[in-house]
Amino acid sequence: MEFVSGYRDEFLDFAALLFGWFRKFVAERGTMGTSLEGRWRQLESQIRRLPQDPALWVLHVLPNRSVGISLGQGAEPGPGPGLGASRLLGDEPPLHLRDLSPYVSFVSLEDGEEGEEEEEDEEHGERPGMEKVEPQEGGEPAPPSKRFPQEAKPAPESEVTQQEASREEGSREERPEDERAPEKRKGQKNAEAAPLHLSCLLLVTDEHGTILGIDLLMDGAQGSVGQNPGTENLAPRAYALLCHSMACPMGSGDPRKPRQLTVGDAHLHRELESLVPRLGVKLAKTPMRTWGPRPGFTFASLRARTCHVCHKHSFEVKLTPCPQCSAVLYCGEACLQADWRRCPDDVSHRFWCPRLSAFMERVGELASLPFTYTAEVTSETFNKEAFLASRGLTRGYWTQLSMLIPGPGAPRYPWGSTSSLSCLLNGDPYQLLQGDGPALMPPVPLEPPRSLFGSWQDYYTWRGLSLDSPMAVLLTYPLTVYYVITHLVPQSFPELNIQNKQSLKIHVVEAGKEFDLVMVFWELLVLLPHVALELQFVGDSLPPESDQQHFTMQRDGPEVSLRPGSGVSARFNSGTKEKGGRRDLQIRVSARPYHLLQGPKPDLVIGFNSGFGLKDTWLSSLPRLQSLRVPAFFTESSEYGCVMDDQTMAVATGGGTSSPQPNPFRSPFRLRAADNCMPWYCNAFIFHLVYKPPQGGTVRSAPGPAPRPPTPAAPPVPARRRRGEKKAARGPRRRR
């Protein structure tokens, strides 16, 4: 697929942006010995003429003593477009952080210090997952930071690691086994090189949280752990960083200089007192001794655009959309022509341009939502992190929608682990949907809905939600399932009579993300209270420790209880009603590709934001669905994704997909794309699979998996005469 905006982890784009800016900064800064009287003198005169930013700028000095970066086999240093690791993964960029696990892992440098003497007897001083620092050719150990420009080449992995460090600190004990790969590779002598140590990070932000520049002080030796990274030699680097941040700010906005600057280190503050005024910038009288941002401070979303062909960021080149479709961004005529003439023709922009132009016409339709915040969240410059933080949505399931990490002292919520659900539930299925303020979900209405809902407006009105509530972002998953059951299946498969079924078995395929939000599906029983539901989450991205788990959520008075699944399947199959005529919700987990799943045939299959062309297992799972021939509905985050899914379905099975239609229960949050301007929304469009007719379909026009020759075939003439005689004989008897 050419465009992966709706499928790629935002954090990877964020890391690629940081590294792209950092790589440009290192290239323009030159070697560390470059005198300030050189190129930076020329830059000073340019900066003095820049317009002034009224916001306060902050230079943060952030040491790191505990986390190291271990590069796996094949992780060779070298710059490349975006994340350097993408070069190791072929032409397709990585879509998830776990895609980098063979190349990058985290190691605890503190553990290495504490256990060094004990491990020395057994492993000659080597910790599990890391090797002893090797000396250079002359017998000298690698210098700590003098070789920083050379050491900067592996920075893409370092960048990801630095940003993940806080999450690693808070959830180390909760990581699955495959996340602790370095410990498993104990005894492999040539597994990986010495861990990189990012000793210090210099970060320039404004008072609103926009990141403007970054510098990494890295050394490859573990021996420096525990030592305070000295700031006596940081002044030239910090000054160069400030100059580059003003001339080429990483965040949004044109080049500018701050009205005032404050520094987070006392010694560095003194060193910069004579340098910063040369830029026409006022330095605060005293350093920022503690972290003291404004109450609403949060790092703003960074979504710098990139050229679709060369992947250069907007701070490197000027980007303009294609003049015909306005959908794809290019840095100039050369990249536009290269994309226009690509071979084969069906991947060229010449082929896709009119189609992308039609997709762009959906911008207004997809942004037509009833919420009070619609204009903000559907904007191309939507700052999602600031939106969530301003509403106190920084814990529970909300953390999975953004890159915000809970700070020290904040409650930790495990992700995607059914074993933790019992302690998290506490009788309230909406606990993980709450923010820091008042309850977001009102009590369940006493009466079930009397009509079917086909829009967020109707659902919010019945549920007692204000149109200012952002709950639609999480409830898009259960409401999409509800819409498929109540509207789309009756329209496309009326013979199933699904609305009259008392129990439904639904398979949710490739459901790694949806399983991490499993409690939102309780809303299905609120909307369909008289239907017994079984949701089976299937996919190899599910936690391996959750495989074959089975539990039931059941209403007990005003609360909801969670029970293991032993003996529950009988209740589901029998259709026994719970108290008040309500039924329970069963959850099953199968951590495997769908084509390897064994079990009863489902009533319905659903997949969210599937991206058939991005994962090879779909080439096996789609034929499996073809053989089952059950209604299978899928959502996509863009109309482009629907077209690619149709092509993949044709290749895998010879079938196709229905025409996609906008999902009225799509997420209101627009997904910002890096190399294009197309509208991307989670669950934006819905389609269903159109299966290839069975092999016997050409012989008989009547559909059906197994033909019955005796019934429709022309019977022998004598038999027809006998039936006629019988009918004639019966006629007079009836009249008498």
UniProtKB/Swiss-Prot annotation:
Null allele outcome, as annotated, is:
Since CXCL16 and ZMYND15 genes overlap in their 5'UTRs, CXCL16 knockout also disrupts the ZMYND15 gene. The double knockout mice display severe depletion of late spermatids and are thus infertile. This phenotype is probably due to ZMYND15, rather than CXCL16, deficiency.
Q: Name one Pfam family in it.
A: zf-MYND
Organs and tissues of expression: Testis-specific. Expressed in pachytene spermatocytes and all developing spermatids, but not in Sertoli, nor Leydig cells (at protein level).
Bias (Basic residues) ranges: 719-736
- Output the InterPro entries linked to this UniProt entry: Mss51-like_C, ZMY15, Znf_MYND
Positions of the UniProt region annotated as Disordered: 70-94, 109-192, 556-583, 696-736
Give start-end positions of Pro residues composition bias.
704-718
Q: Where in the cell is it found?
A: Nucleus; Cytoplasm
Instruction: Indicate which residues the UniProt annotation says bind Zn(2+) 2.
Output: 322, 325, 349, 353
Renumbered to this chain, the Basic and acidic residues biased-composition regions fall at: 124-135, 165-185
Q: Which PROSITE patterns match?
A: ZF_MYND_2 (PS50865)
Among the entry's GO cellular component annotations, what is one?
cytoplasm
Q: What is its main location?
A: nucleus
Does the keyword Zinc-finger belong to this entry?
Answer: yes
The protein's job, in short, is:
Acts as a transcriptional repressor through interaction with histone deacetylases (HDACs). May regulate haploid genes important for spermiogenesis.
Q: What protein name applies here?
A: Zinc finger MYND domain-containing protein 15
Q: Which organism is it from?
A: Mus musculus
Q: Which gene encodes it?
A: Zmynd15
